[in-house]
A protein has these predicted regions:
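M16 family metallopeptidases and their MPP-like homologs
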Residues: 17, 23-36, 41, 60-116, ...
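Short, polar/flexible loop-turn hinges at active-site or ligand-entry regions and domain interfaces
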Residues: 53-56, 98-101, 120-129
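Acidic/histidine-enriched alpha-helical segments
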Residues: 64, 120-144, 231-245, 342, ...
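Short, low-order "capping/linker" segments at domain edges
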Residues: 142-146, 247-261, 366-376
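Soluble acyl-CoA-dependent acyltransferase catalytic core bearing the H(X)4D motif
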Residues: 145-155
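Active-site glycine-rich loop that binds ribose-phosphate moieties when present
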Residues: 182-189
Length: 435
C-alpha cells in the first residue's frame, strides 16, 4: 500500500491510497464540523436531501441510472459522531478498471459523479427542492424514533448524554424532532452553504490507479476549484486533550420502559496519570477487562456467574472513556454492578496473568492486521488519524501494543474512576426525551 496526502488548499485535503490488493475502488468525501446543538438536526438532514438530486441529475432515479451505468457502482451517505465533531460522509464503491472488459476510466467517472452530488446539489431560488426536504424530514423523524426501539443503542447513547449533557459529545447525531418544525428548504440550504465553506473536507480515493491522473482530476475539478480556503474549526479530541476531573460519587440514573431485558451501561473516566502515551495501555486494559471472549466481563459476569446475556466494554480514545455495556435480567442489577466493581478492583490489584496479556496482545494485533484487509476499514483508520492529529502507522501500532507490560496496565488501572451508572429496566412505556 502507498499513501499520499496532499493539501489542495487550507482545510481541503486529498488522500490517495494506492493498493493492488482489491478489485474495487472506494471514493469518499468526508465533511467534518463541530457538534453544536443549534444546527445538529439540519446537519443530519443534509446528506439525505442532497442524495436525492443534483443540478445535473435532478432526481434520485437519474443518479441511480448513472450509478448503474458505472458497472453497478454503489453510492451511499451517512453521519458519524467522532468526539465533539460530526462527520458527513458520501461514498461510492466501484469496480476497478483492471477488472472491466475494457478500460473506460470508470474511476474518473465515479469521482465526477460523487463530486457533482456533494458540491452541486439541486437548488431552486436559493433553496433545496421543497419536496425532497419534506420527504427527508419525515424519514429523519422516523429514524430518531427508531433509536428508542433498539434498546442497546438507546441505553448507550443515553449514558453518553447524561455524562456529556453540556458538550457536543452528548448530542444525538440525528438531532431532535422538535427542530424539524422550524427547518425549511431555504434555511437548510443556507446551512449547507455554511458547512461547505467552513467544514474540513477530506477526499479519499482507495484502489489501484495512476496517482498523477487522479491528482490532476481532483485539482482541476471545477467544484473543488470553487471551494474557499478555511480555518481549522474542529474540536481536537484525543487522549492528550480530554482531561478528566476526579469526582466523589458517580451519578446513577435508572429509567423505566417496556423492556424484557435490562440494559446496564457504566461510563468510566480515565484520569490524568504519569504514563507517557497510555492509549496502547488503555487498549490492553480494556481488552483484558471487557473486550473479547477471554475478558473478565465475558468469562466471569456472563459465563461463570450467568449475570448477563451480553457483557462487553469499549474504549473511546477520543474522550478518554471506557463504557461497560451489559444486557441483564432486571432483578440481577445489584449483583451485576457489585461484581463489575470487584473486577475493576482486581485490575487495580494486578489480578491478571502474563498469559492473559499474551492472549490479549495476539487478539489486538490480529485486529490491527485486519485493518488493511478491507478498504472501508483502512479508510476509516486513516481518517481517524487525520481527525485526532495523531498519525500512527499500523506497524508502529503493533509494536506499541507488544511493548505494554503488566506493571503499566496495573498502574493505568489506578486512573480509572466510575462516572455514571445508567440502567434501563422494565416497568414503563415511554422513554425520556433528550437532545
Amino acid at each position: 500500500m502507498k499513501y499520499i496526502k496532499q493539501n489542495i488548499k487550507d482545510g481541503v485535503t486529498l488522500h490517495l491510497i494506492i493498493n493492488e490488493n482489491f478489485k474495487t475502488d472506494f471514493s469518499v468525501v468526508f465533511i467534518s464540523i463541530p457538534l453544536e446543538k443549534e444546527d445538529i438536526t439540519k446537519n443530519a438532514l443534509i446528506p439525505a436531501v442532497i442524495k436525492n438530486g443534483s443540478k445535473k441529475y435532478n432526481n434520485y432515479q437519474l443518479i441511480n441510472e448513472e450509478i448503474e451505468m458505472l458497472y453497478g457502482a454503489s453510492f451511499d451517505c451517512g453521519l458519524d459522531k467522532t468526539g465533539d465533531n460530526l462527520v458527513l460522509k458520501f461514498y461510492v464503491e466501484s469496480i476497478n478498471d483492471n477488472f472491466l472488459p475494457e478500460k473506460n476510466e470508470n474511476l474518473e467517472q465515479v469521482l465526477n459523479l460523487l463530486l457533482e452530488i456533494v458540491f452541486n446539489p439541486l437548488v431552486e431560488n436559493e433553496s433545496f427542492k421543497n419536496q425532497y426536504v419534506e420527504l427527508e424530514k419525515k424519514n429523519l423523524e422516523l429514524l430518531i424514533n427508531s433509536v428508542k426501539d433498539d434498546k442497546d443503542i438507546y441505553s448507550y447513547e443515553k449514558c453518553i448524554n447524561i455524562m456529556y449533557k453540556n458538550s457536543g459529545y452528548g448530542l444525538s447525531k440525528y438531532g431532535n424532532i422538535e427542530d424539524l418544525k422550524t427547518i425549511n428548504s431555504k434555511n437548510l440550504y443556507s446551512r449547507y452553504k455554511e458547512i461547505i465553506s467552513k467544514g474540513k473536507i477530506d477526499i479519499i480515493v482507495s484502489g489501484n490507479y495512476e496517482k498523477e491522473k487522479i491528482q490532476r482530476q481532483i485539482e482541476e475539478n471545477q467544484f473543488i476549484k470553487n471551494l474557499n480556503s478555511r480555518e481549522d474549526i474542529l474540536n481536537i479530541n484525543n487522549f492528550k486533550t480530554e482531561l478528566k476531573e476526579k469526582i466523589d460519587n458517580p451519578e446513577t440514573v435508572k429509567e423505566e420502559m417496556d423492556v424484557t431485558q435490562g440494559k446496564l451501561v457504566i461510563g468510566l473516566d480515565i484520569l490524568p496519570n504519569n504514563l507517557e502515551d497510555f492509549r496502547f495501555i488503555a487498549i490492553m486494559y480494556n481488552a483484558i477487562f471487557g473486550n473479547g471472549v477471554n475478558s473478565k466481563l465475558f468469562q466471569i459476569v456472563r459465563e461463570k456467574e450467568s449475570l448477563a446475556y451480553t457483557a462487553k466494554s469499549e474504549y473511546v480514545v477520543q474522550k478518554n472513556n471506557i463504557f461497560i455495556r451489559c444486557g441483564i435480567e432486571c432483578e440481577k442489577y445489584d449483583k451485576t454492578v457489585e461484581l463489575i466493581k470487584v473486577l475493576l478492583e482486581q485490575m487495580k490489584n494486578g489480578e491478571f496473568t502474563e498469559e492473559d496479556i499474551n492472549k490479549t496482545k495476539e487478539y489486538i494485533i490480529s485486529g490491527i492486521d485486519s485493518i488493511n484487509e478491507e478498504q472501508d476499514t483502512q479508510i476509516l483508520y486513516l481518517f481517524g488519524q487525520e481527525l485526532s492529529k495523531l498519525p500512527l502507522k499500523t506497524e508502529e501500532y503493533k509494536e506499541k501494543i507488544k511493548a505494554v507490560t503488566k506493571e503499566q496496565i496495573t498502574e493505568f488501572a489506578q486512573s480509572i474512576q466510575l462516572n455514571t451508572i445508567y440502567f434501563l429496566k422494565s416497568g414503563g412505556e415511554n422513554a425520556d426525551n433528550w437532545e
